């Protein structure tokens, strides 16, 4: 799931901020940008609403069942972890 509405510069800045790794599982492979609050629910392209996820965590975040990850986080748990990660990143 690629967010075509993000500029290359914004995408690069988020990857850099997150250390070029998935913010949840620490994988450096298959990275994608995820909107913590979906745009369809009023979320924006503000960096505080964006997080780097690997393709597996991103798929799970959007409700795709991954057989090899059955004991991994649920979409709700991923959403909560994303909120916590971004909040910690921007805490004063």
Please name every model-derived segment.
Residues 30-40:
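Short recognition patches in nucleic-acid-associated and regulatory proteins
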């Amino acid at each position: 799931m690629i967010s075509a509405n993000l500029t290359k510069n914004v995408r690069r800045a988020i990857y850099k901020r997150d250390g070029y790794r998935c913010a949840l599982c620490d994988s450096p492979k298959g990275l994608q940008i995820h909107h913590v609050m979906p745009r369809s629910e009023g979320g924006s392209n503000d960096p505080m609403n964006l997080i780097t996820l690997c393709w597996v965590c991103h798929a799970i975040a959007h409700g795709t069942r991954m057989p090899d990850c059955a004991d991994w986080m649920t979409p709700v748990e991923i959403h909560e972890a994303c909120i916590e990660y971004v909040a910690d990143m921007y805490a004063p």
